[in-house]
């Protein structure tokens, strides 16, 4: 039948993670008492899970799949999740076909419902083989349903869910959930706007529940069905199929206009309470009183761990829960019991505060890694700007500066979007050379990146990630680019093509300025901190010409795509790929402050875009990509591309004699902070990176070991990866990627791991970087705003430059 897992003896207090809180104030109030503590049970190994539920006899059940064979496994616990009995499940079979599951779930009586389809075995295509639209016809699989009985036998179920569609379009397979009363509920309809209730024994239809629009999710609380969508939460009675009304108080609390984190609702098996979780923690909504309370804070639980993905959360009893997570850091499963302890403080007394202007999930994860190693430290994450909270960037910075000057500021500051030089000149940032220099000496971090931030032997700031700008495209084209003028000339040359865009981004006038700033905006200010009118005028003239070529090309490409899509059956004549609607309201706000704050968010993308080499591997819809490599995976894509297309290459873009890099997640320590030593420990941890750095799109980690380990074939083999070597390419194979489009064109590409020559070249390029860019967001936003007015013909070139000078005169004189 299987094996029994052993219970872990140690009971750990909840891990200290991270909570998003606006502002910088720190209270000195006496700690309140009581919080949930985590007891980790030894979980099933070599598998991942996708469901956790309570059966009607009180047993706890999980369903998952083997990491090795991807076949389904059931897990049953008779003691509240402390020990598990496992059993491999047999799926329905058809001769000559393979079985693929869509959805699988436990019915309350212990039977298992499975949704599946049969398909021909996959045949590896020959190298370079491509299916064309002439010989490819996509066929929707025939979705089937069966019951796996408690004795392992299989019973087929005849269900035709396509009858609920309002048109001929298929919505794919239908998701289902099993209710505590034994019934099964399917999400159906052409737009997934219906829920159908079937008897769990006979599978006869009992009730139909219709939403106003697409139903995003549905859960059960006692005899109530709760459906959720973007803007409403509705309760139904599953005993009679009648609507009971909207949960107005919950809508306001969970999905209202002021809410920054969209909730995920949980099937907990509770009879009276609806649970949901967000980035901030787990909440309980009392169905009787209509009140909502946070019961588990992500700052002190695994719910704050970005590497743990919640699969199930069930109510075992009063103030007692069991949760199952898929743990990406270990490719395993975590089973955690939560019990309320009224005799401990609600948060650990030992606290440290980290601040960023905008929310940063990379920082979240890095702090999570620190907190796992330091469970007695409460790391509080404070965010200056939360979207739609009414706080402007100016307000947030004033609050931060006031707190720092008053000695109540955060201990660690993420300096992205802040004026670090101003803080340094005022003595507000601590010298970190005592923790950075040892990391340089033992080659933990890139020496040249750290040296770019060393002044008179002191280091006040340092990035944890960085990119460096490259231009990707046809070798002959990109080799002609050496400065802004030559880039404009190349744009002109490529503007006559109609079947491709010039760049792989759609640009408005403003975002084009943002994308060019790091390379060509460093001379907008003179040494006396006044506007360099000659340099800015030259920039406006050249970029105006460039923008005209881009617009001409985009218009032609849009027409080309409309003509192409018009060949598809069922084409909507009203369809348009014109981006004018996107640009029409760009940056428009009711007030100037709100306009500026909108730009703050947009700067995150266009100042530091990724080249996305994978787009050139498949449907190459653009001639050029300009930006930085987003990290390890993007470099793998680049190496694969270069080995598959000898005409494509890349060129590192420089700023005159400067080999620039674009830093991100720049950390500094508050010189007036009260926890400097702990702050240094946290910064050291941030510089180590974390286990999922390979999947980051922030660029390369400053931690050299991360790069070495990511491309180490020996380490991959030690970790259990079976790697095939392609002698013709002189590269190990990572795997294959597939692509298909609406016309039936499909293609597969063998992904290649960088070899030693590739890795050494990458290191050489990185080690020659010598200048980290800085961003004056106030200057940049004003320049982009006036450039937009100029190219739209609202004002003359001379007036646009004069407006920049006049509007920034006071700011630049401070």
Residue ranges, per PLM feature:
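Extracytoplasmic/periplasmic substrate-binding proteins
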Residues: 550-681
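C-terminal capping/gating helix-and-loop segments adjacent to ligand/active sites or protein-protein/ligand interfaces
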Residues: 661, 725-812
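Conserved Ser/Thr-centered positions that define the repeating blades of beta-propeller domains
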Residues: 77-78, 179, 197, 268, ...
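Extracytoplasmic/periplasmic solute-binding protein
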Residues: 460-464, 469, 488-587, 598, ...
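Periplasmic-binding protein-like
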Residues: 496, 684-724
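Short, well-ordered beta-strand elements
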Residues: 348-360, 377-384, 412
């Amino acid at each position: 039948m299987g094996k029994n897992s052993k219970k872990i003896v140690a009971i750990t207090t909840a891990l200290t993670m991270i909570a998003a809180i606006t502002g910088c104030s720190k209270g000195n109030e006496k700690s309140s008492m009581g919080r949930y503590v985590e007891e980790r049970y030894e979980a099933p190994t070599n598998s991942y899970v996708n469901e956790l539920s309570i059966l009607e006899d009180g047993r706890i059940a999980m369903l998952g799949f083997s990491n090795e064979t991807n076949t389904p496994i059931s897990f049953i616990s008779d003691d509240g999740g402390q020990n598990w009995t496992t059993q491999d499940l047999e799926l329905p079979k058809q001769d000559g076909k393979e079985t693929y599951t869509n959805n699988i779930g436990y019915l309350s009586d212990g039977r298992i419902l499975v949704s599946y389809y049969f398909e021909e075995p996959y045949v590896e295509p020959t190298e370079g083989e491509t299916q064309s639209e002439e010989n490819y016809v996509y066929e929707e699989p025939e979705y089937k349903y069966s019951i796996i009985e408690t004795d392992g036998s299989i019973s087929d179920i005849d269900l035709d869910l396509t009858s609920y569609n309002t048109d001929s379009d298929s919505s794919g397979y239908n998701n289902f959930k099993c209710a505590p009363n034994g019934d099964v509920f399917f999400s159906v309809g052409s737009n997934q706007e219906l829920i159908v209730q079937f008897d769990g024994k006979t599978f006869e239809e009992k009730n139909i529940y219709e939403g106003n629009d697409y139903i995003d999710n549905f859960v059960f609380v006692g005899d109530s069905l709760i459906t959720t969508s973007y803007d409403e939460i509705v309760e139904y009675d599953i005993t009679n199929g009648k609507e009971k009304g909207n949960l107005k108080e919950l809508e306001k609390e969970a999905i209202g206009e002021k809410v920054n984190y969209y909730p995920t609702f949980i099937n907990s098996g509770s009879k009276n309470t609806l649970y949901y979780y967000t980035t901030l923690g787990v909440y309980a909504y009392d169905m009787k009183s209509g009140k909502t309370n946070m019961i588990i804070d992500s700052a002190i639980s695994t719910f704050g761990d970005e590497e743990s993905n919640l699969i199930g959360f069930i109510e075992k009893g009063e103030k007692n829960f069991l949760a199952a997570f898929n743990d990406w850091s270990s490719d395993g499963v975590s089973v955690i019991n939560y019990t309320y302890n009224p005799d401990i403080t609600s948060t650990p007394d030992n606290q440290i505060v980290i601040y960023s202007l905008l929310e940063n999930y990379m920082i979240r994860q890095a702090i999570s890694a620190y907190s796992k190693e330091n469970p007695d430290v409460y790391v509080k994450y404070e965010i200056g700007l939360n979207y739609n909270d009414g706080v402007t960037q100016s307000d947030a910075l004033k609050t931060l500066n006031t707190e720092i000057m008053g000695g109540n500021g955060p201990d660690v500051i993420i300096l992205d979007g802040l004026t670090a030089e101003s803080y340094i000149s005022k003595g507000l940032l601590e010298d970190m050379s005592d923790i950075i220099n040892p990391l340089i000496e033992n080659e933990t971090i890139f020496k040249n990146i750290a040296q770019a931030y060393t002044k008179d032997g002191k280091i006040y700031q340092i990035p944890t990630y960085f990119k460096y700008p490259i231009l990707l495209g046809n070798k002959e084209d990109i080799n002609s680019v050496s400065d802004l003028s030559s880039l404009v000339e190349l744009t002109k040359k490529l503007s006559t093509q109609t079947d491709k865009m010039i760049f792989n981004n759609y640009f408005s006038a403003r975002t084009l300025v943002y994308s060019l700033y790091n390379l060509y905006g460093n001379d907008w200010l003179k040494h006396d901190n006044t506007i360099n009118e000659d340099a800015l005028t030259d920039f406006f003239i050249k970029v105006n010409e460039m923008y005209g070529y881009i617009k001409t090309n985009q218009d032609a490409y849009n027409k080309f795509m409309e003509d192409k899509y018009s060949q598809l059956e069922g084409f909507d004549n009203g369809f348009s790929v014109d981006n004018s609607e996107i640009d029409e309201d760009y940056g428009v706000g009711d007030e100037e402050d709100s306009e500026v704050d909108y730009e703050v968010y947009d700067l995150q993308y266009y100042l530091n875009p990724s080249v996305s080499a994978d787009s050139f591997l498949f449907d190459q819809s653009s001639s050029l990509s300009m930006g930085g490599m987003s990290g390890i995976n993007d470099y793998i894509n680049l190496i694969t591309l270069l080995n598959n297309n000898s005409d494509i290459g890349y060129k590192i873009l420089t700023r005159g004699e400067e080999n620039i890099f674009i830093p991100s997640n720049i950390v500094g320590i508050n010189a007036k902070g009260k926890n400097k030593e702990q702050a240094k420990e946290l910064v050291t941890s941030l510089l180590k990176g974390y286990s999922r750095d390979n999947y980051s799109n922030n660029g390369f980690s400053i931690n050299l070991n991360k790069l070495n380990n990511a491309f180490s074939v020996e380490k991959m083999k030690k970790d259990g990866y079976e790697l095939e070597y392609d002698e013709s390419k002189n590269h190990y194979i990572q795997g294959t990627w597939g692509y298909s489009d609406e016309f039936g064109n499909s293609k597969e590409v063998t992904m290649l791991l960088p070899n030693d020559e590739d890795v050494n070249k990458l290191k050489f390029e990185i080690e020659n970087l010598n200048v980290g860019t800085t961003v004056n967001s106030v200057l940049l936003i004003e320049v982009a705003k006036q450039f937009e007015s100029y190219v739209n013909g609202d004002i003359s070139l001379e007036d646009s430059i004069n407006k920049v000078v006049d509007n920034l005169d006071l700011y630049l004189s401070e």
